[in-house]
């Protein structure tokens, strides 16, 4: 079993404590930039931005903010699709992982293995269930300004399958079905994650059809 080390780097961009809350979900991001520029940005007080962790393409894991404190990663909310959003600042009850990546969300193998390991650590430490509501993308909090964060190539299917196998659970939905759902969401045909194996209600079919017509400018 590969063991990873977490390197503390710190940042002034955080709020002490969590206002009485505890983490209920992990939010995955991509940096849209490369190291060391991305780290410098998250350590710059003028940026007013940070994350708990930054995973580099070579597999190194950097920690900027303690789990017990509030990182400034998900505070801007617009048209959220995240079902656990309760109307308050999501930073208070989420853990954020940034992945060094210019765009698209494709991770190197070293980066993926580091991310998988870190997800396992956080799931165990904070008793976070493995689900699409508790391991999410930044785009589910801000669908308007962050529609492609962490991107279409982010390995959601592999991540969930590996996490489910690690916990000894079901293998879950086949990856190709998950990919279809994610592509439909990215294209605006649906607004949130849906289980591909659940039957579609009439209202859902109509909603997809109307979204398609809107996309076509009808």
Q: Which residues does each predicted region cover?
A:
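Secretory-pathway/luminal and periplasmic proteins that interact with or process carbohydrate-rich
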Residues: 35, 142-149, 191, 214-215
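Exposed alpha-helical structural elements
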Residues: 37-38, 158-162, 179-180
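Short, solvent-exposed alpha-helical surface patches in non-cytosolic proteins
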Residues: 170-218
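Solvent-exposed, acidic/flexible segments
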Residues: 21, 46, 87-90, 104-112, ...
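N-terminal catalytic cores of peptidoglycan-degrading enzymes
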Residues: 1-90
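Sec/Tat-exported extracytoplasmic proteins
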Residues: 30-32, 65, 122-127, 163, ...
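Basic/polar, cationic surfaces and motifs that engage anionic cell-wall
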Residues: 1-8, 15-16, 92, 100-172
